[in-house]
Amino acid sequence: MLEVAKVTKNDIVYDLGCGDGRIVVTAAKKFGCKAYGFDVDPKRIKESLDNVKKNRVEQLVTIKQQDIFTLDLSKASVVTLYLLPSLNVKLIPQLKKLKPGSRIVSHDFDMAGVEPDEGFPITMKSNGIEHMIYRWTAPIKVKKEE
């Protein structure tokens, strides 16, 4: 996902629904960028914090228990999503506020009504299953209903 978003050291990555924190940890370790993980589940926040500490990336990664649907995304240059399609769609109003040029990437699920710039098929090394990674660039263009 991070490669598809073309993350660099200068990016600020926001992972919405960060789960165990693997994306923000990878962003910090592989690219040396600042990364923020957000989740509402206290158990997932603890897992993320443990993962950050275990990987010694506390100086680059921040984990917050916060509602992703009210989150200020103005500082993000990359937003990662691994959420159900209905949640991706619910995030559209927030994603429309991203600064121009910001990248959004989603694992497996697109956003109904918003055409991705590109879709990348990837095959998981662990099990050989193919997944899709979708990428959008802000400002996103929502299709008008006819």
Where are these regions (language model features)?
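Glycine-rich SAM-binding Motif I of class I
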Residues: 21-25
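Conserved alpha-helix/loop element of class I SAM-dependent methyltransferases that forms part
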Residues: 1-10
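Conserved SAM-binding motif I beta-strand of class I
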Residues: 34-39
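A short SAM/SAH-binding and catalytic strip from SAM-dependent methyltransferases
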Residues: 74-90
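C-terminal substrate-binding/active-site "lid" region of AdoMet-derived donor-dependent transferases
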Residues: 86-146
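Conserved class I S-adenosyl-L-methionine
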Residues: 10-19
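S-adenosyl-L-methionine
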Residues: 45-75
